[in-house]
């Protein structure tokens, strides 16, 4: 599982902006991966934001689509506008938590795909087979859905992943 938050934390935004500045990034579609320390370590204190990856390219897999769903926008149009015109006027719309859950073949799930798609009909954005090349990391069947609250998203994860 992974998800796009409905609003990034201020310290994560700050870390991203400082990373852009440090790498002198202009007019690029980039993605950075940060994590928050859950205890004091050599890298920093509990709660600190630490960079895991700095990528000068869009994120892979289905995450650009999830960014679109989470922000009611089109990140590819924004990128094209920036490349063509130096800026984009496209605004984000309503914000959501966008959840990805992957199921593995051969597991005995409590709820069928039909059960999940009916229960979460208003939230589901995509249900599809994951390409074999990605299935080792992401599962064989993916569910992508939007939620207004983290609690709703957590309930979705619980239902999608529950086994007998």
Q: Each PLM stretch: what is its role?
A:
Residues 26-28, 46-48, 137:
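Residue-level preference for beta-strand/loop junctions
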Residues 1-2, 10-13, 17-22, 156-164:
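Conserved ATP-binding module of the ATP-grasp superfamily
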Residues 35-39:
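Short beta-strand micro-motifs enriched in acidic
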Residues 78-164:
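Peripheral (often C-terminal) accessory segments that flank ATP-dependent C-N-forming ligase machineries
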Residues 4-7, 71:
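Alpha-helix N-cap and loop-to-helix initiation/capping positions
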Residues 42-58:
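A short beta-strand motif that forms the metal-chelation/ATP-contact edge
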Residues 11-32, 55-106:
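Active-site "cap" helix and flanking loop/linker of ATP-utilizing ligase/carboxylase catalytic domains
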